[in-house]
């Protein structure tokens, strides 16, 4: 329905990005389609706990989805981009990749790992007109943050120089820019969308 609403041609694919058969599934799906030239890695989960209380499965679930999943999908779609000598790869990371966050050792590690993966890949493929960048959101107004008590949201906003949460459109605009031809000479960078929470 989303594709039809925008008057575009395309199709959707639902898959578990943590499984090793991702490559074969994507190949089969794209067999009769024009290979995509833009990849946005935005799948992610959280499973919070203090490190001493964190179970192995909590660590593995977050790392497998957020980091390994991004690796598997990127590797699968990279071949066609290299063949076409053009592509845009964008990873969604987080402000916690730089700042860390209480009870989110697994999530912070996965997002920091993505930033390292992105910069390494940028060095490998940028000579083929494939750019690789990250967008790192801070606190964004989502269904998850809407349920927080107002006093909690106010305290969180106090730590943001702009004194407010971002909107999903702020993240989407950053992704749209990095996917565009206007960003053709930008690679290996992290575009912070966090209202000034983290200033490298």
Model-derived regions: residue spans:
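Residue(s) in the substrate-gating loop at a strand-loop-helix junction
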Residues: 94
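Substrate-binding pocket helix/loop in short-chain dehydrogenase/reductase
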Residues: 50-51, 55-63, 145, 156
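Short-chain dehydrogenase/reductase
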Residues: 1-36, 47, 57-58
